[in-house]
Amino acid sequence: MQRLYDLPDHALIDMGGFVGGTLKYLPAHAVAWLTIAGGFAKLAKLAGGHLDLHSARSRVDASALGAMLAALGADDKAVDMARAAAGAAEILALAGSRERALARLVAARAREVALAALSGETAVEVAIVDREGEFLARVGG
């Protein structure tokens, strides 16, 4: 994100799994633009309504991700395997050619959760990146 927007270090806040703290802070301290960027698993948790994304306090909803895969046209076997998956990385791998479409759906739902927590004065972008730092999805803003 820093390279994309040519931002100085002080323009970035690394909140880790505590995006909820950021979202609770912003209504009283509004900013014009917020980009929430992270990996697929963290943002799948946000898409599921979790504001604390730490692994000890929230889990990826494999059933919901399986339903998203079904909506994207995945076959029943892939959907069933996704619903039984041990983690988000496995589900993303099962998505195959639908990987980016699934990431876009997750990013869009995560954005809806973030917008619901804010006052509406902040434009919200959600970006999902892979382990190499490449974008899988970007929505909003």
Roles of regions detected by a PLM:
Residues 129, 133-141:
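C-terminal edge-of-domain segments
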